[in-house]
């Protein structure tokens, strides 16, 4: 999982990426390409 300050560029890496909020943290998840998973931090 990649950790980044801003998720804007990580969200644009693939068209299936979506931003979700879990337990106070913001994540980018991708159901089709798992390698695009990321967290803000």
Curated annotation (Swiss-Prot):
Keyword set includes Transmembrane helix: no
Record-linked SUPFAM superfamilies: Ribosomal protein L36
GO biological process: translation
Top-level taxon in the UniProt lineage: Bacteria
Pfam families given in the database record: Ribosomal_L36
GO terms of molecular function: structural constituent of ribosome
InterPro entries with a match to the protein in the record: Ribosomal_bL36, Ribosomal_bL36_sp, Ribosomal_L36_bact
Cysteine pairs bridged by disulfides in the record: none
Family: Belongs to the bacterial ribosomal protein bL36 family.
NCBIfam families: PRK00831.1, rpmJ_bact
Protein name: Large ribosomal subunit protein bL36
Encoding gene per record: rpmJ
């Amino acid at each position: 999982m990649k950790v980044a300050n801003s998720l804007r560029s990580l969200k644009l890496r693939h068209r299936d990426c979506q931003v979700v909020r879990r337990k106070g943290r913001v994540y980018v998840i991708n159901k089709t390409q798992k390698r695009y998973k990321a967290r803000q931090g």
